[in-house]
């Protein structure tokens, strides 16, 4: 018994070796970095998603803008076509009403060229044509300016000469050379007139010669 060897329990030297502080700190920092990387990745993905959403909305708004611009351009072109059509055919009704007047003038001219033309009939026909024209003009707001005997109005009358008159007041229209016309009160052309002016007053002279 005395000679029995004592068995010394083996121990793992490596496991009992003290841990290197530097290695421990490195592992700790690595773990922390892994833990910190996860939130950063999630945040980056969220930012990328927001960016994609913003790009999608920007594309949508851009397409809406393009459609709106195209619609405005189409409306502008339609408006221009309507204006052009309005300018081109604005006098269509007036022209249609004038055609009978032209027809009557042509018939009157043909009658005047006949060998047995009746002057009285031609005059009456001409008066009828003039009446037709005046009726057409009145329907479209054309007014005749015939200021015979009226006071001279430079807004509607054009004086081409003056004439002395002892009977008419100064600046009175004595003669209408050419009638004027207005459209709904707006002057088309002035009436050409002769206007009165005061006559020269003569005074009896005194003979101073003896």
From Swiss-Prot:
Key word Kinase present: no
Gene3D superfamilies for this protein: 3.90.20.20, Head domain of nucleotide exchange factor GrpE
Keyword flag Transport: no
InterPro entries: GrpE, GrpE_coiled_coil, GrpE_head
Positions of the UniProt region annotated as Disordered: 1-42
Superkingdom in the source lineage: Bacteria
Role according to the record: Participates actively in the response to hyperosmotic and heat shock by preventing the aggregation of stress-denatured proteins, in association with DnaK and GrpE. It is the nucleotide exchange factor for DnaK and may function as a thermosensor. Unfolded proteins bind initially to DnaJ; upon interaction with the DnaJ-bound protein, DnaK hydrolyzes its bound ATP, resulting in the formation of a stable complex. GrpE releases ADP from DnaK; ATP binding to DnaK triggers the release of the substrate protein, thus completing the reaction cycle.
Family: Belongs to the GrpE family.
Official protein name in the record: Protein GrpE
Species of provenance: Nitrosococcus oceani (strain ATCC 19707 / BCRC 17464 / JCM 30415 / NCIMB 11848 / C-107)
């Amino acid at each position: 018994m005395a000679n029995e060897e004592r068995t010394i329990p083996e121990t793992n030297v490596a496991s009992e070796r003290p841990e290197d502080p530097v290695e421990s700190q490195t592992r700790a920092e690595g773990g922390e970095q892994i833990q910190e990387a996860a939130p950063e990745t999630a945040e980056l993905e969220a930012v990328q998603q927001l960016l994609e959403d913003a790009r999608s909305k920007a594309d949508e708004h851009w397409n809406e803008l393009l459609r709106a611009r195209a619609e405005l351009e189409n409306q502008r072109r339609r408006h221009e076509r309507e204006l052009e059509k309005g300018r081109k055919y604005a006098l269509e009704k007036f022209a249609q009403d004038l055609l009978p007047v032209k027809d009557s003038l042509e018939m009157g001219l043909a009658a005047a060229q006949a060998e047995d033309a009746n002057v009285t009939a031609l005059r009456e026909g001409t008066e009828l044509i003039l009446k037709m024209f005046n009726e057409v003009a009145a329907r479209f707001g054309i007014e005749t300016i015939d200021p015979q005997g009226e006071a001279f109005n430079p807004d509607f009358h054009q004086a081409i000469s003056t004439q002395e008159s002892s009977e008419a007041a100064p600046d009175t229209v004595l003669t209408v050379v050419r009638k004027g016309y207005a459209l709904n009160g707006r002057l088309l052309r002035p009436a050409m007139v002769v206007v009165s002016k005061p006559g020269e007053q003569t005074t009896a002279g005194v003979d101073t010669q003896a």
